[in-house]
Structures are given as C-alpha cells and as structure tokens.
Amino acid sequence: MSTDTGTTESKPRHGRPGSLENPEVAYENVPGHVIPILEREFDDFDTEAGKFLHGDLREDEFIGFRLKQGVYGQRQADRQMVRVKLPMGGINPEQVEAFADVIERYVPLKKGHITTRQNIQMHHVPLDDAAKLIRELGDTGLSSREGCGNTVRNVTGDPWAGVCDDELFDITPYAAAYVRYFVRHPTTQLMPRKIKTAFTASDADRAITGIHDIAFIPRVREIDGEQVRGVELRVGGGTSIMPRVAPTIRDFVTLDDGEYLKVSEAVFRIFDRQDWLRKNRARARIKVLVDKIGA
C-alpha cells in the first residue's frame, strides 16, 4: 500500500536565519528579541564598509547604506556613532552583558549613552569595529537596523506598560508587532524625514504621545456586544522648529485585526509621496503636512 500523500517535504534549512543559506526569518518569542536579525545584512555591511575604506566606494554612496544600519559618521576621520534600538525600552540581562562586552572591546571611551528615545549609542567607534559590534549584538537579538536615516526610528513606550494598574490592557505586544511590520518595509526606507513613534499604556500618557509623529493610546469599545481593543491615533506632533501637539486623527482604530497597522501604513504612504517636503529638510516632517492639509 502506498504511503505517498502527494506532498513534498521541504528540505531543512542550514545556517542562521537571514543568512544566504537560510533566507527565512522566523520570529523568536524571546524577551528583548523584537526586530528580526538578518545575517546577510552584517555580511553586506562588511562588504560595503570594506569598499569604502579601500576607496572603492564614494562617501555619498556609502552614507545611505550606513545610516540604515544605525551607523552615523562623526566629524573625526574613521569614527562612527552606533545607535542600537531598544524597542519600547526593553532589554534583557543577556543583552546588558553584551553591551558591556562590546563597549569594553570596541568603544574607545569605554562607555555608552542611554538616549531619551530608548536607544543605546556608542561613540568614536572605528568603522571596521562598528561592523563587528553590530554583528555581535545581533547574536543576542539586538538590532541597529533603521536606528538612523529617514525611516521609522526606535519605537518608544511607557516603561510601566504591562504592570501598571491604570492600563486597559497591555499595549506591548501591539507595539512589538508595529516594530516588526515597519522595519525594512519598502515604504519606510527613504521618506522625506524620520518617523518617531510612541505607544503609551494609559491616559496618564507616560510615553508623551503629543510630541510624536505618530502615537497610540489604548482604548476599548463595545462592538456588537464584544469588548474590542483599539487605540486612539495621534499624528503630527513634534518639538524643535514649529512645536506641535499631535492632534487625534482617529478616535478608535482596532488592534487585533491589524487595522492600526494598515492605517499607519496609509499615513506613511501619504507622507512619502509629498516630494515638496523633501526640498527643505528642516520642515520635512509629518507635522508640516498635517498643518497644511489638516487632521
């Protein structure tokens, strides 16, 4: 009797997820592992950095690539600032140890900086060491991908999300899904300017949603007799030039069906198409667009 079911088993993949041998990226449900790590991005960085250091790649050709990997050039020759994202400010003990290790070995000043947007930055790193640093941090689930450039920057959150008694529900899983959805997203790779995002846990607004380009506040509504989780969506806040408090553009956007991701993507697509904003970097922010067309 034949046992052939008519299906073909896929061959097992070899190599780390994201490598050329294994291009598939599986989400790891591990605390602190939010952004999928792609091994081939480290290989590409090694290659492009090598070309630049050997004079085979112009600086203007290298800058865009470097920024997407979270590496900023400094005014000092061959010195970089590396910015590593901590989505929602989350970090686990293994990652703290990894930071201590790479800072001791690769950062001349032997220190890092915790930023107001829940990143960790390391300064004065030689370019060839920057490549090693981001690769080694990647082994612990840490990523610098799109920590710089005109992308969706690190997503910040309420430090008390998930444990505070004034929240309607834990917003953290939805924030993490947003991070994974927009990292490497084709629409968000070269927008007119960067996007700063916040997810807060409650109306206490400890994440300060009003100063962000896009921000989310938990809401619950009864729909057809069911308690449905959603968010109030605010767009167009900011400080610096033209300080603005982000207005609410949608009172309620559902979460569990992914509608909040679709609406966010629509906002970014509209923003990305505004080529007139690209002419003046200082004004190329979503708040300027909201001022012009309204919320």
What are these regions (language model features)?
Residues 2-295:
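Peripheral terminal and linker regions in Fe-S/redox and tRNA-modifying enzymes
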